[in-house]
Every structure is written in structure tokens, then in C-alpha cells.
Amino acid sequence: TGFENTQPGKRLVGRALTMRFLPPRPDLTEAALTLAKEGNWDRRYYARAAEEANPGDVVVAELGGSDGHNLFGDMGATGIQMRGAAGVIIDGGMRDYTGLRDERFADFPILHKFSDPHTTAWLGVEYNAPVRIGGVTVLPGDIVVGDNGGIFFFPSSLVERVLDYADESAAREKFQLQLLENKEYRFRDIYPLSPELQAEFERLRN
């Protein structure tokens, strides 16, 4: 996926709290400032999340994967973490790479494209609205699962189906590994399971 994890090996699971950023221009910046003042929220969307995120949220920030523009640093991440959020996914950069790998953030993985020491100049234009991450549309409230192996987004309505599939896949892989260790079947019959072994797997599962 091209994302790096500040906490390698730590899996991120939660609900998507989305935000989208664009390069600034004077009229857009003025409009954003007006909306923020009228709504009494911080126009810096990471700061808004540090005030509004709910426990279990995963902040999902679309920055277009652009080099040289980042979302936040240590302070912003700490604010979001203190709200009980599960982590952050940034289709762009972040600051304070060394600090964000500190043990203080051991349970707060940040999946990001790159790190950059400069303060971002990009402007938040949408909050809790559809965003695009790696060519995938993400809606607010979608379930997020991410680690070093990749990032998955799916509608919350599919949670039970996805969990059932994950459980079955894990059980099948365990069954296949046991068959390999027993050395009683050919590899081609184990991976994928032959009809005979598939039937045996289903019998054991039930």
C-alpha cells in the first residue's frame, strides 16, 4: 500500500473519522475560516478531531499522497490519542517521526506515506465526508483495519460477514498447516484444499 506504520506490528482497528485537504488559495481559505467561526470549530481539522473524536475512531486524512505536505506532529497526535482514538491513517505525511514512535504511542499506530519536518500549508475542506485513500472510497463510520500488510475499509453493515470470513480463513490456514506438518498429503491437495480435504475441513468446523 505504500504506508509506513509508526508502530510496526501493531494493528489498527476502528471506525473512520474522515477529513480531506487541498492546497490553499485565498478565497478557499477565507471561506473555510468563515465556516469554522460560524460552526465554532477549529479550521485545522486535526485539531478539530482532537476535540471531537470518539473512543475507537480512526482518523482518516486524505492529502492526495502528495510529497511535502503533512497532517500533524506530536501535539496533534497526542490530542487525538487523548480522545481515545485508535490511530490515524494519513494519505500524506506527518512531522515528529521519532517522537511518534515513542512508547507513549505504543497503542496508537499512525499509518502514513512519509515524514517531513515542515508544517503543512494544506487546507481542510471536508470533515466527516467521503474521502479517497489509495483509490478506495471511504465513508464516515466505515470499519478500518490496517497494519504493515495493508489497509482495509468496509461498511459497518458488513462487520459480521467480514468477521465470519476472517475466522474461516484463519481456521482453514491452521488446518492446512497441520496437514503440511503431518506430511500425509501432497501440497497440491492441501493448497488449495482438494474436495476431499475441504469436506473434512467443513466437518471439523461444524
Residues of each region from the PLM?
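Short alpha-helix capping/helix-loop boundary micro-motifs
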Residues: 3-4, 43-47, 130-132
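General beta-strand structural signal in soluble alpha/beta enzymes
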Residues: 1, 21, 60-62, 70, ...
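Extracellular/luminal Protease-associated
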Residues: 48-92
